[in-house]
Amino acid sequence: MRIKICGLTQIDQAQAIAKVGVTDLGFICVQKSPRYVTPTQLATLTEALPAHIGKVGVFANQTLSEMLAIISQGNLTTAQLHGDESPELCQQLRQQRPDLEIIKALRIRDRRSLEWAKQYETVVDALLLDAYDPQQLGGTGHQINWDDLRQFNPAVPWFLAGGLNPDNIAVALGQLHPDGIDLSSGVEQSPGIKDLSKVQALMTALQAIASQPLHA
């Protein structure tokens, strides 16, 4: 299972978190976000990370040309589209950067929101389900109703996000079986500043889950 920590802004924290067993680190490329990093900061952050760590840029309602420039400057391996991007834009991005992993985030209000997934399954590499918030695009701490996701079985891998933290991850993974998890505010002191003790608590909880007979 992929483990993604999102909203990094500090080099020392990114390097420390990269060592504890996560697979991907996410960086917010949306200017209105309190976790925003500039393209120059992004390049500095990604250059400091090991090659095996996925470097995910999070975008929202940005132009194709803007995304391509940031992806190139930031040496990103993955683009996560967290706004209202169309399947057509996803396809255009894939045509321009066939080497790039594309994740489409869907902001889930209720079970009906899951129907949007079908539109993207043929044009992205993975989906990410986050809780809907009218004011923020992510990192809200709001939780999806997990009961709505029990039958979710898309044709591509998917990440569970939305209010996950070290205290509820075992319950979440006891009910659902995503291909990856994504945490931001659940392992923070404040927006963009991670709490390394919470990240370690998350990894400890995941190790305990993995050691259970059902997951062995």
Swiss-Prot record:
Recorded catalytic activity of this chain's protein: N-(5-phospho-beta-D-ribosyl)anthranilate = 1-(2-carboxyphenylamino)-1-deoxy-D-ribulose 5-phosphate
Listed name of the protein: N-(5'-phosphoribosyl)anthranilate isomerase
Keyword vocabulary terms for this entry: Amino-acid biosynthesis, Aromatic amino acid biosynthesis, Isomerase, Tryptophan biosynthesis
The enzyme's E.C. designation: 5.3.1.24
Matches recorded under InterPro entries: Aldolase_TIM, PRAI_dom, RibuloseP-bd_barrel, TrpF_fam
Gene (UniProt): trpF
PANTHER family xrefs: N-(5'-PHOSPHORIBOSYL)ANTHRANILATE ISOMERASE
MF terms in GO: phosphoribosylanthranilate isomerase activity
Species this protein is from: Picosynechococcus sp. (strain ATCC 27264 / PCC 7002 / PR-6) (Agmenellum quadruplicatum)
Pathway in which this enzyme or protein is active: Amino-acid biosynthesis; L-tryptophan biosynthesis; L-tryptophan from chorismate: step 3/5
Assigned protein family: Belongs to the TrpF family.
Pfam families with a match to the protein in the record: PRAI
Top-tier EC class: isomerase
Biological process terms in GO annotation: L-tryptophan biosynthetic process
